[in-house]
């Protein structure tokens, strides 16, 4: 491909982005932000959650996962209600090749497929915290069966200990998903949690861009670009969190890019976050790459029906 064709192809490329609005409490909520003394955690391990010993039982893992359909102008797919994962997304207007009958481009794929690639949000406990938080096996309920541009979807899960977790998901006319995380606390005491978001890739792709195009983990934090390789994540991952790279800052974005496609998460641009790249070995030469953000200041939700952080 000559340079002119390359530039045209790049200009025509689509971008899949997910915006996460962390720190926007509604005025009537009893939410209070405060700086906790403990350090900000990295992204939780894949398929791991908090203390779920007192949580309601999850659905039978042998049954097909319940899903919410996605149908917008430029994309279609579905959202997995087990784990609240955005893991099935196809671009309606782009094909893999120029040949007749070529399949549409798939940018997100579930964990049980050959090339898993997905986006996930959640909450992590502060040090010493014991809130039962949703994990990869939590089955959420949805208020609608289909997510469209005109119809956002809200997912809910009650942990049985007084806290109700909610995730509101909306999509625009292009490729942007707006995701709002909210906790309603009916317990008697305040709870402190770190919201997080991440792009997860469960395989090592064959890189095709050469020296002209970066492929792999990428981020911009405090207006500074960082590009890393899959190899550097595998070599640099340090137990117990298997974090290979981290940077604290304000706003920005982070994700994993291919030759033409990018999946990224975008925190609220005035929020203090820690961006991380990590690699979780899963056996043999296989593993999972995670790129994302964790809030540096925990979400503190007052008891007695206090709630936060919903979009205003």
Enumerate the language-model features and the residues they cover.
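Intrinsically disordered/low-complexity terminal segments and short unstructured peptides
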Residues: 9, 39, 51, 137-140
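Generic low-complexity segments that are intrinsically disordered, proline-rich and/or Lys/Arg-biased
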Residues: 38, 42-46, 57-58, 117, ...
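Subset of Sec-pathway N-terminal targeting signals
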Residues: 1-46, 147, 159
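Soluble non-transmembrane domains of integral membrane proteins
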Residues: 67, 71-312
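Short, Gly/Pro- and small/polar-rich lid/capping loops
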Residues: 42-68
């Amino acid at each position: 491909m000559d340079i002119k064709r390359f530039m045209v192809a790049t200009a025509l490329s689509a971008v899949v982005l997910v915006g996460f609005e962390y720190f926007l409490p509604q005025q009537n909520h009893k939410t209070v932000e405060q700086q906790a003394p403990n350090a900000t955690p990295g992204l939780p391990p894949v398929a791991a959650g908090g203390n779920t010993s007192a949580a309601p039982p999850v659905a039978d893992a042998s049954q097909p996962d319940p899903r919410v359909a996605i149908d917008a102008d430029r994309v279609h797919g579905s959202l997995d209600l087990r784990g609240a994962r955005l893991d099935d997304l196809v671009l309606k207007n782009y094909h893999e090749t120029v040949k007749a009958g070529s399949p549409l481009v798939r940018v997100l794929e579930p964990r049980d497929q050959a090339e898993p690639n997905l986006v996930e949000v959640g909450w992590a406990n502060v040090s010493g915290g014991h809130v039962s938080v949703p994990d990869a096996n939590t089955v959420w309920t949805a208020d609608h069966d289909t997510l469209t541009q005109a119809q956002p979807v809200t997912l809910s899960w009650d942990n049985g200990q007084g806290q109700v977790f909610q995730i509101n998901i909306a999509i625009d006319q292009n490729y942007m998903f707006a995701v709002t995380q909210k906790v309603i606390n009916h317990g008697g005491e305040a709870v402190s949690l770190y919201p997080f978001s991440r792009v997860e890739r469960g395989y090592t792709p064959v890189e095709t861009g050469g020296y002209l195009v970066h492929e792999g983990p990428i981020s911009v934090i405090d207006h500074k670009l960082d590009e890393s390789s899959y190899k550097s994540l595998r070599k640099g991952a340090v137990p117990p969190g298997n974090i290979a790279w981290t940077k604290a800052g304000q706003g920005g974005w982070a994700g994993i890019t291919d030759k033409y496609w990018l999946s990224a998460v975008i925190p609220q641009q005035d929020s203090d976050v820690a961006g991380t790249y990590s690699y979780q070995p899963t056996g043999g030469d296989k593993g999972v790459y995670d790129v994302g953000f964790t809030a540096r200041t925990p979400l503190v939700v007052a008891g007695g029906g206090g709630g936060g952080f919903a979009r205003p």
